[in-house]
């Protein structure tokens, strides 16, 4: 079993949800890999990786929900803890095994631009 590693940087405006599906796919395909289990990881304590429906309504509902129910000084760390900082997604035949509207998302819960 071969292990490949790729790293890339995503700029965020803070308190943001960013679709990284195609960026992750490009990183995989550059190695000529078409079938694998892919692990995506966000190394920051205030960001997460999520795999869920990516529509304006879903994103807005999630952000509103998290603001309403997580009102602590360290809210960004708590949100990251709840969602998790990694996800594993099957990659078969050069495509992710995702539902029609599902995407791989970077969720940045920090209030600052980075």
Residue ranges and their predicted role:
Residues 1-114:
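Active-site histidine-anchored catalytic micro-motif
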């Amino acid at each position: 079993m071969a292990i490949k590693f790729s790293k890339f940087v995503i700029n965020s405006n803070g308190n943001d949800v960013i679709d990284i599906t195609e960026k992750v796919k490009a990183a995989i395909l550059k190695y000529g890999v078409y079938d694998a289990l892919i692990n995506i990881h966000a190394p920051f304590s205030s960001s997460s990786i999520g795999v869920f429906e990516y529509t304006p309504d879903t994103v807005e509902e999630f952000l509103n929900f998290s603001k309403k129910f997580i009102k602590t000084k360290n809210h960004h760390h708590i949100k990251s803890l709840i969602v998790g900082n990694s996800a594993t997604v099957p990659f078969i035949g050069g495509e992710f095994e995702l539902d029609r509207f599902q995407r791989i998302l970077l969720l940045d819960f920090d209030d600052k631009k980075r």
